[in-house]
Amino acid sequence: MRGLLVGRMQPFHRGHLQVIKSILEEVDELIICIGSAQLSHSIRDPFTAGERVMMLTKALSENGIPASRYYIIPVQDIECNALWVGHIKMLTPPFDRVYSGNPLVQRLFSEDGYEVTAPPLFYRDRYSGTEVRRRMLDDGDWRSLLPESVVEVIDEINGVERIKHLAKKEVSELGGIS
């Protein structure tokens, strides 16, 4: 059986890793769609799709998950929910089950006839992309929330400096002091 998981992964954190490990106990292969692939260089979406592919590939390898068990596919957003499932199906191998905690994603795939399962969330208050990015901006401990290989990717691309620089830009655009 092949499953599908869609997420922005901004950045890929330990909660994502636990969800993937849990899903891989139920399916033979997992398609991991990196959502909003066209977005980057903003506080909400600081990393490019390519950088997120690096994060996932390295983290899954670091945790002993064979590459033969998953596909990582960046997927750009489309602005029409009625066509979104078809868009995903066009870009991915066939799949049998969809894993999502997002009510809209659940609804769209269930209306298209797919079995949809809400994956367990692991310490959602701590393991969320929003919390990781907040800690990066506030010089907090963000590293402990991520697999070591993801920390290395973020260091390699100067990700924290990028987010802090973007925060200055966005404040100045709002008329604040930069």
From Swiss-Prot:
One of its GO terms (biological process) is NAD biosynthetic process. Its main location: cytoplasm. It is an enzyme of class 2 (transferase). GO terms for molecular function: ATP binding; nicotinamide-nucleotide adenylyltransferase activity. Its EC number is 2.7.7.1. Keywords: ATP-binding, Cytoplasm, NAD, Nucleotide-binding, Nucleotidyltransferase, Pyridine nucleotide biosynthesis, Transferase. Pathway: Cofactor biosynthesis; NAD(+) biosynthesis; NAD(+) from nicotinamide D-ribonucleotide: step 1/1. It catalyses: beta-nicotinamide D-ribonucleotide + ATP + H(+) = diphosphate + NAD(+). Belongs to the archaeal NMN adenylyltransferase family. GO terms for cellular component: cytoplasm. It comes from the Archaea. NCBIfam families: arch_NMN_Atrans, cyt_tran_rel, PRK01153.1. This is Nicotinamide-nucleotide adenylyltransferase. Homohexamer. It is found in: Cytoplasm.
